[in-house]
A protein has these predicted regions:
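Short secondary-structure boundary/capping elements
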Residues: 67-71, 95, 135
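Short, flexible, solvent-exposed loop/turn segments with mixed acidic/basic and small polar residues
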Residues: 74-79, 99-102, 141
Length: 143
């Protein structure tokens, strides 16, 4: 299965690593699709594809801000119990300390971009589709 290293994604997309204590060298992105985990933060995990890169935009961010610390901790624990390749905060939004603490404990890299959610999503999807596209080699002989 084709994959792209998270290190390459960080370099190409100019992402800031908010969890440098997590070794990202061995993390692979294998899915060109992404997910905005709004429903998962609200507790709905049916049909959740944890292999996708997760993006937190302004809507998810403001939802999380409105939760109590206890509810936040519970939502983060449920989300990060899955084997997520990484979570990217858009618009230069910064996660709260509970989020970072949970991510570090579950070894889920947390990244940040200054780009708007829509701009980042379209750029990363386009780039991942090219990098993860099926590829075949055909050997031929000219006579």
């Amino acid at each position: 299965m084709a994959s792209v290293s998270l290190t390459r994604v960080i370099e190409k997309m100019k992402l800031e690593n908010l969890t440098p204590e997590i070794d990202v060298k061995h993390v692979k992105i294998t899915q060109p699709d992404i997910n905005r985990p709004a429903l998962q933060l609200a507790g709905y995990f049916e049909h959740f594809d944890a292999t996708r890169l997760q993006i937190i935009g302004f809507v998810e961010y403001t939802y999380m801000e409105g939760l109590t610390d206890e509810t936040r901790r519970e939502a983060y624990e449920k989300l990060m119990a899955y084997d997520i390749p990484c979570i990217v905060f858009s618009r230069d939004l910064k996660p709260d300390p509970i989020f970072l603490e949970t991510a570090i404990r579950h070894e889920v890299p947390v990244l940040s971009t200054k780009k708007s959610t829509s701009d980042f999503m379209s750029e990363i999807i386009r780039w991942l589709n090219v990098k993860l596209a099926p590829c075949i080699s055909v050997h031929g002989v000219l006579v």
